[in-house]
Amino acid sequence: MSKRAFPSFHEQKVGIIQSIIYREPFWLLVAVMLLNQTPGKSARPIFWKLKERYPDPDSLAAADQGDVETMIHTLGLQTQRSRRMIKLAQSWAAMPPQKGVLHRTKNYPQRRDGLNIGERIEGDAVDCTGALEIGHLPGCGPYAWDSWRIFCRDILRGVADDYNGLNAKQGFEPEWKRVLPQDKELRACLGWMWLREGWLWNPGTGKRRRAS
């Protein structure tokens, strides 16, 4: 269980950085790249400085790797992370995610998912087993894919105006309700979101029961 202190049930946002920047999906992916294997209290200040220095994908795509390394060196793995962030920005600038275009994500969300489909799939679909709109972007893995699905996918697909079904059609189920993340903070986040709806949720199985 995450040690993060989650907000009360009266709050509308969970407090993790993904819930703050979900309307800027490129930066959500950069943030999770920095957060991977790094405490949020260390990564967050550097993330905001990086975003201020390089305000859009094009500027980060053209950044000098050495400059990026210098900005993030206190987090460790600065060479690998800076290279990945720049490649991510270049790929995003060249081919940003599009509604109705999914790219293969091998072994996601479960082992062997995506092994028997093509690299690119045309057509919008609720089911994203083995393929996602961001599956072509380098440097992304299950943590980034889970974060994208929870906070960004419904908006890109045009089925809701936020990650919790704002202005969606009656009977709509938000994407986050179908995600089973491995990351402890994402699990705690979803546990909190389910509990706000009156459910105790098992992060390993996805099963739930009414909270007493």
Predicted regions and their residues:
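C-terminal accessory module of base-excision DNA glycosylases/AP lyases that mediates lesion recognition
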Residues: 1-23, 101-138, 142-212
